[in-house]
């Protein structure tokens, strides 16, 4: 039985994951938050799941690395330097980092990449996301994940074509860019729309998160899949065999 430890266990996602572990056939190895011993949890668990804060991820990754324990990182708002640290850690342990653990969003990312590859550059790509009023980062990790999928479909990088906001006299839209719009309000769990717009027609690919359990189920599935895997950086698509 896979023992799963949770960093950020007192948060919304941490609690939801803890409630599902035994239902999904795992064992809850315990949780750790800001004042708790991250090293001890890394030793006790077969695999770790991190849904804490971006500022805490470095310490949690170091604990996982020291204990040689695989880790699923679902925390969003990570910096480029943190992604480089994840790459370095993945040379020694199995790491799965994702902006969204929903199985539906994972499939959406594949559809977005395929659409971007098939449609010409005269199709503009815009990504719109909405979350609850308490979310602290924007665009969401999921929106960026979808943007990366679209950019990959066009054989480029998101950093080369990303436009985060428009205000005032911005001029005409530059061809090939990928735009983002972020909305915050109420208790929205997470809505994402990827819009492909051309002259005279528009395609919209949408995902609506209606229950936080979809992310918790995906996180537990990912953790149980990752346990025992060789060192490397994995993605949610690997969990689904996509």
Predicted regions and their residues:
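Rossmann-fold NAD(P)-binding glycine/threonine-rich loop
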Residues: 62, 75-96, 106, 111-115
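Short, acidic/turn-prone active-site loops that include or flank metal/cofactor-
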Residues: 34-36, 76-79, 100-101
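C-terminal substrate-binding/catalytic lobe of Rossmann-fold NAD(P)-dependent oxidoreductases
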Residues: 3, 7, 12-45, 122-242
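Structural motif
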Residues: 7, 51-52, 74-75, 98, ...
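Beta-loop-alpha module in the N-terminal Rossmann-like domain of NAD(P)-dependent dehydrogenases
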Residues: 48-66, 77-82
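Rossmann-fold dehydrogenase core element
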Residues: 70, 85-102, 120-125
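Short acidic active-site motifs
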Residues: 36-40, 56, 81-85
């Amino acid at each position: 039985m896979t023992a799963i430890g949770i960093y950020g266990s007192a948060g919304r996602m941490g609690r939801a994951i803890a409630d599902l572990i035994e239902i999904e056939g795992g064992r809850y190895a315990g949780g750790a938050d800001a004042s708790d011993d991250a090293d001890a949890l890394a030793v006790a668990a077969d695999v770790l799941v991190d849904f804490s804060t971006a500022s805490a991820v470095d310490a949690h990754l170091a604990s996982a690395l020291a204990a040689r324990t695989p880790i699923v990182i679902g925390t969003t708002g990570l910096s480029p330097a943190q992604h480089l640290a994840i790459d370095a850690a993945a040379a020694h342990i199995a790491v799965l980092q994702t902006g969204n653990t929903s199985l539906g969003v994972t499939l959406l990312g594949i559809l977005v990449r395929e659409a971007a590859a098939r449609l010409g550059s005269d199709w503009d790509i815009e990504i719109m996301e909405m979350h609850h009023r308490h979310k602290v980062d924007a665009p969401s990790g999921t929106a960026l994940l979808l943007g990366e999928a679209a950019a990959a479909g066009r054989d480029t990088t998101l950093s080369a074509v990303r436009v985060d906001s428009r205000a005032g006299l911005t001029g005409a839209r530059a061809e090939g860019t990928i735009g983002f719009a972020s909305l915050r309000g109420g208790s929205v769990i997470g809505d994402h729309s990827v819009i492909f717009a051309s002259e005279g027609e528009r395609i919209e690919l949408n995902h609506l998160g209606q229950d936080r359990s979809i992310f918790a189920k995906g996180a537990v599935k990912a953790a149980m899949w990752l346990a025992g895997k060789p060192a490397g950086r994995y993605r949610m698509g690997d969990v689904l065999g996509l």
